Amino acid sequence: MQYHVFATDFDGTLSHDGVVSSETIEALKRLADSGRKIVLVTGREMYSLKNTFPMIDLFHWIVAENGGVIFDTSSGNEIVLSDPPPTIFVDELVRRGVKGISVGKCVVATWTPFENIVLDSIRDLGLELTVVFNKGAVMVLPPDINKATGLQRVLLEMGLSVHNTVGVGDAENDHAFLKVCEFSAATANALPSLKASVDLVLKKDHGAGVVELIDRLLADDLQSYRTQRNNALVIGTSDDGPVLLHTFGDPMLICGASGSGKSTLANKIADVLTESAYQFCLVDPEGDFESFPGAIVLGGPNAAPQLDELMHALEQPGSNVVACLTGISIPDRPEFFLRLLGSLNQLRARTGRPHWLILDEAHHLMPVDWQPPAELLPEDWFNVVLITVNPDSLPLMVLNRVSIVTIVGSDANETLQAFGSATKKVVPLLPPPVLTTGEVWQWNLIDSVTPIRYNAMKSTREHTRHRRKYAEGQLAPEKSFYFRGPNGNLNLRAQNLILFCQIAEGIDDETWLYHLRRNDFACWFRDIINDENLAAEAELAAMDADLTATLSKSQIVAAIQRNYILLSSSRISVPGAM
């Protein structure tokens, strides 16, 4: 379920001339029975609302006085969000003959045609106040108070997000709160300016329009209107225009060879989610996202992330969380992910958050023989990004839930064919030329027959591969370096650069020079560590026939120490160094 909160205006929306129909009341009860929270967002003061509509327990929270006061109906707790109106201002309105003045805990209200006197009084007194119109009503508030700020404070109190909120209104003062809602609607009697700014204009007016919206929400969580919303996020550009990431979308698979741009695209997705305040949880087996700006990073090479700490961090709607698994051995990662996935499913069922789940190196979490309990992997697994090298490294039950296949790298056709072979799906042949740096193929299995080729937008944040991963992390066996020697008598595995240096210190000269002269070190540094400079250093050492084993070890290990080990907490000795 995407929408957990229903926010509605009162006068002119829920009610008609202050009266809420029995049909509207029944619809609100049905909505509450679905587990959703209902928030009333009104310009009225609490006493006025209670006198007009005593059934306030239909709502979980009330935003009153146009955002100045919030009220928890279950506890009766009222929170005033600003200072009271200046007495000098109220006195001046009375002195100038303004009629129908109502003074609340934050708001001063009157009616037209006194708006000009109100504006003149604010100017003449030199006050910083905001005038808000609600059809015939004229409301004066502190400059930082409106229906949007009140709604956002209520959502914070409930631990929920505007991105899981549907809003409906009819008048000028509804613009602010409808703008922050993920989905906005206007009743048929709404002002033209409001109708022009919302996602859906209802066919019916007042309470009947609210009932119409509730019925549609209960029918399919408004997913039939997904393509009509204006809040999709741009992640690239094609010849046909921008390429969009729908904020409530189908599972996406990003695949391609190492170094082909998977992490760059994933970083851009995390980037745009952050910029638009969509919460994500990124599971990072290899430490590629340890330094993502603004995210809470839990776990690392020396400590596994604790599940309770992860979930506590995610309870805050504004917190993005990276779960770094470099401190968990590769065989133990699927079990950890099973426990994490169960907790994430529960949080999503309760709040709709985290909005997105990004799984880097997904084959570490869900290997091909992975068999989770059926309830942990729902058929409608939404807002998930899976990142891997080869599609066939993931279990079929996961691949069958993928709706969008995104491919990077020069071997895109082979990668897409591998997806087809694994899923028994007929996949298209990608036309030439091969992809260049920054280009992406995307195939939508549901909506598009022909894949689209686009340029992925670069991240506005600098994302660097965290070097501690290679210094201290646990590389997979197939990515580790093996000292075997000229006769294959050894099989010493270095799954990170610290171990590489430690083994190098104790290895015999013949074995060291054997791998050096064959450029085995250079290939590992370039293809696995993704460090061209370190690879070049090893190649230069290999080309110098007069360089002894001791000196070449000293040079290469010193280069590793300069660029990697100093970033970690571990120490190593450098052969030949004092």
Model-identified regions with their sequence ranges:
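P-loop NTPase catalytic phosphate-binding loop
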Residues: R229-W356, P367-L377, F382-V385, D392-S393, ...
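Mg2+-dependent phosphoryl-transfer enzymes with acidic/Ser/Thr/Gly-rich catalytic loops
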Residues: M1-Y3, S21, L141, A148-R229
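Terminal, compositionally biased segments used for targeting/anchoring and flexible tails
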Residues: P431-M578
